[in-house]
């Protein structure tokens, strides 16, 4: 019987009988703990807002394992050629780290590869523009805006107008504008009409105002009569 709170531990013989494997060595446990701590520490740094307490605990664990391995001479004795011979448990962290780095590289490819097709397209642009031959920019605008038939008719009409203006003399030009009523363009008549209208309206307004108001002499006489009457009343009292 075992005391309360104690755990039963199997011996080496009992482990073999029960089918359990041998307990891994301390160095392997320490190495696996170091690998997991490094992976967790890197994942903490990848977060936007890492947990400070968690990252400090993981960093202290890594530092403690490093000190133990340096005291045992394993830290300085690790050679790069022994990496291929390492067990699978030790390579788990390196595989995870390499996988994350490869995924980041696939998501964000190198800028040189992205710029290459752009440079090729830019180099092809002048070739395409120069292949049909040099064209007048005015002709390209005509082709884009309207069909060829409309363009020809419009140019013919413009040519006819310019020819008529060049061939006719000043008298013919005056005949063109003879139908226009010149009274609309006579500035003197317009201004005189405006001034006469304003004068008549102002005079009418002043005459009406003068007729409505009584003469000043009559108002003064009435005021004096009222004052005399008031003075007489005061004297009698």
Swiss-Prot record:
Question: Residue limits of the SERTA domain?
Answer: 26-73
The GO cellular component terms are: cytosol; nucleoplasm; nucleus; plasma membrane
Tissues of expression: Expressed preferentially in hematopoietic progenitors and mature blood cells. Expressed at low levels in the heart, lung, spleen, and thymus and at a higher level in muscle.
Q: Which InterPro entries does this UniProt record tie to the protein? A: E2F-SERTA_domain_protein, SERTA_dom
Q: What is its main location?
A: nucleus
Is Glycoprotein among this UniProt entry's keywords? no
What keywords are assigned to this protein?
A: Nucleus
| Keyword rRNA-binding annotated | no
Q: Where in the cell is it found?
A: Nucleus
Chain's role: May participate in the regulation of cell proliferation through the E2F/RB pathway. May be involved in molecular regulation of hematopoietic stem cells and progenitor cell lineage commitment and differentiation.
Read off the PANTHER family from this record.
Answer: CELL DIVISION CYCLE ASSOCIATED PROTEIN 4/SERTA DOMAIN-CONTAINING PROTEIN 2, CELL DIVISION CYCLE-ASSOCIATED PROTEIN 4
Q: What is this protein called?
A: Cell division cycle-associated protein 4
What's the source species for this entry?
Mus musculus
State the taxonomy lineage. Answer: Eukaryota, Metazoa, Chordata, Craniata, Vertebrata
């Amino acid at each position: 019987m075992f005391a309360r709170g104690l755990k039963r531990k199997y011996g080496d013989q009992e482990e073999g009988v029960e089918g359990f494997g041998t307990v891994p060595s301390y160095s392997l446990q320490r190495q696996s703990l170091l690998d997991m701590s490094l992976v967790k520490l890197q994942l903490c740094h990848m977060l936007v807002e890492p947990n400070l307490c968690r990252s400090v605990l993981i960093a202290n664990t890594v530092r403690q394992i490093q000190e133990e391995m340096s005291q045992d001479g394993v830290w300085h004795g690790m050679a790069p050629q022994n990496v291929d011979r390492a067990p699978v448990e030790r390579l788990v962290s390196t595989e995870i780290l390499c996988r994350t780095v490869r995924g980041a590289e696939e998501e964000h490819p190198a800028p040189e590869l992205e710029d290459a097709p752009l440079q090729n397209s830019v180099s092809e642009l002048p070739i395409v523009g120069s292949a049909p031959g040099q064209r007048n920019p005015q002709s390209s605008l005509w082709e884009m805006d309207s069909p060829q038939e409309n363009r020809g008719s419009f140019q013919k009409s413009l040519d006819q107008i310019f020819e008529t203006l060049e061939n006719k003399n000043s008298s013919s030009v005056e005949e063109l504008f003879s139908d226009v009523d010149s009274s609309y363009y006579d500035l003197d008549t317009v201004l005189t009409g405006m001034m006469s209208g304003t004068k008549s309206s102002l005079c009418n307004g002043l005459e009406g105002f003068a007729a409505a108001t009584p003469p000043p002499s009559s108002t003064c006489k009435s005021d004096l009569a009222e004052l005399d009457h008031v003075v007489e009343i005061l004297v009698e009292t």
